[in-house]
């Protein structure tokens, strides 16, 4: 129930006494930022934290400013089943996942006014899908299943984070095990990897790599309502220290595969490795069927003089590694 200016004053007060006692382990101070599209909070908190007598080198007395955003909370108390949903809810969910880019752009534009050198990292403290709990489970435990809809939400969101890595310095899915959009579900001694787990496994190659500028031509908007239209394909690209390019692609369509040509500048496809996560929109893994949805080798591509040509299946996440 705090106002942003009151919170900012408290933050300035308390951060004063969070001191660094080990120069080899510096304290990383994160200021509590906005929930979703509360842009006023971001603006007022930064204004008050940068206000004199704050020295310029203190960059607002913070190293990070958080943003908090879940897909699904906009539905209120009854958010809908994690596994029983229709095509309309598919596009509704993915449109809210795509909104992460707008949030980063608009919060980032405010941060740029106070911190043009981007010394303050945007910290997405919690993100992911929030559905209704599984029937028969404790509502307070927030245990939910995890389908290809969640996998695409993860792929979309991680691509957005990668493309904005100049500002986004940390992003935490909530949670990792048994809660909300978890990467692992457990039951006694048994464990199952969710579709989201495989997306994280595929996207690990972006971590520690350098962003590569990329763009898509011929992207179409798809959906069932004007306000919920999403791009049919979405991407991000990076290159590691050994010169290996990682391309992650998402096909948001439920019915249409996409014929794509990957055009590389100053690079030839000497070696290609690819894996795919694909399935029906309601497909998920259980303890009895733990590998119904899993990452598999992908071979439906051909080398060309300019790069690669491929068919991207509907409802899929693809990783390409080009050496």
Cite the ranges covered by each PLM segment.
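Feature representing long, continuous alpha-helical segments
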Residues: 98-101, 105, 152-159, 194-198, ...
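C-terminal beta-sandwich/jelly-roll accessory domains of carbohydrate-active enzymes
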Residues: 215-219, 225-230, 250-323
């Amino acid at each position: 129930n705090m106002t942003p200016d009151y919170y900012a004053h408290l933050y300035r007060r308390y951060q004063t006494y969070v001191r660094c006692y080990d120069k080899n382990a510096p304290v990383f101070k994160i200021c509590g930022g906005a929930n979703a599209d509360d842009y006023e909070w971001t603006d007022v908190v930064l204004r008050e934290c940068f206000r004199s007598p704050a020295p310029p080198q203190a960059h607002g007395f913070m190293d990070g400013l958080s943003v908090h955003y879940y897909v699904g909370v906009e539905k209120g108390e009854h958010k809908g089943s994690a596994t029983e949903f229709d095509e309309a809810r598919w596009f509704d969910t993915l449109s809210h996942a795509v909104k992460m880019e707008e949030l980063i752009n608009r919060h980032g534009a405010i941060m740029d006014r106070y911190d043009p050198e981007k010394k303050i990292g945007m910290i997405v403290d919690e993100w992911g899908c929030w559905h209704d709990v599984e029937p028969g489970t404790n509502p307070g435990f927030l245990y939910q299943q995890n389908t290809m809809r969640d996998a695409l939400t993860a792929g979309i969101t991680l691509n957005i984070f990668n493309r904005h890595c100049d500002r986004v310095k940390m992003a935490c899915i909530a949670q990792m095990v048994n809660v909300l959009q978890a990467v692992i579900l457990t039951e006694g001694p048994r464990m199952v990897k969710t579709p989201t787990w495989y997306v994280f496994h595929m996207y690990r190659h972006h971590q520690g790599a350098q962003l590569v500028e990329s763009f898509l031509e011929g992207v179409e908007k798809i959906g069932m309502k004007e306000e919920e239209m999403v791009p049919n394909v979405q991407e991000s690209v990076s290159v590691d220290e050994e010169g290996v390019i990682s391309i992650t692609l998402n096909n948001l369509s439920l019915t249409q595969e996409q014929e794509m040509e990957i055009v590389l500048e100053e690079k030839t496809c000497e070696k290609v490795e690819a894996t795919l996560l694909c399935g029906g929109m309601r497909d998920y893994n259980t303890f009895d069927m733990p590998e119904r949805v899993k990452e598999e080798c992908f071979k439906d591509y051909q080398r060309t003089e300019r790069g690669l040509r491929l068919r991207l299946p509907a409802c899929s996440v693809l990783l390409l590694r080009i050496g």
